[in-house]
Amino acid sequence: MKRRLDLSRKRLFLFDLDGVFYRGKERPVKIGGTRIVKKLRSHQKKLLLLTNNSTDSVKTVHSRLLALGIPIRNEEILTSGLLTAEYLSRKYGKVSYYLVGEPGLEAEMRRFGHERTVGEEADFVVIGLDRRLSYEKLDHAARLVRNGSKMVATHVSRLYMYKNGPALATGPIVKALEYATGERATVIGKPYPEMFRMALRRAGCTARDALMVGDQVETDIAGAARAGIDAVLVATGVDRSIRGTRALAMVSNVDDLVEYL
């Protein structure tokens, strides 16, 4: 990265997690993060972590980061599950929902008082990654949507990195339901702008104040650009080039950013 990059005027730093601070979830391997977090704190900068991961609760993510020695506060973690639950609460109040997802997403929905149902009526079908998805569950969700339930998806990423390489993410599930019902889901996570808007609102900052740091062009960099936010790519995850993107720069490791504050 060239020295002319100056991040000193940025007030809010947004970070992706997997591929930026660590790799993997069950046995995460730390990439970096401790130095940049401490530096941002010493400069009185704000930071938030934005992850499309909906399978883990905020509590689980927080415990993982602390175990890796990264001094993050619970309220600085914004998962797609948390923001989906918050979005529904802010716009509709407490809702009933049918879950296509895992316990981490259900935990965030419960925090906001939303009521899970397995019956024939639901205000919403809430969709996250579901690694135990069955035909029966998918068919039931589609039937609910055809009967008037609305769909909201945590994100629509195609793949995520798992133990043995790329695995199907939430996107294929969402697309299957959209195809089966002819309806479109509201999407919260990256690269859609809702996650970025909610982060800016929470921090009390404008898009110009913020910088997004991520490892994926398709979600982190493109999503930030769509929201009017500058971005930097880290070369420790999925992508290794910023050619053809609107990223300001690429760094070898997230902790390299301390040189540009």
Task: Give residue ranges: language-model regions.
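Asp-based, Mg2+/Mn2+-dependent phosphohydrolase catalytic module
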Residues: 2-27, 33-45, 59-78, 85, ...
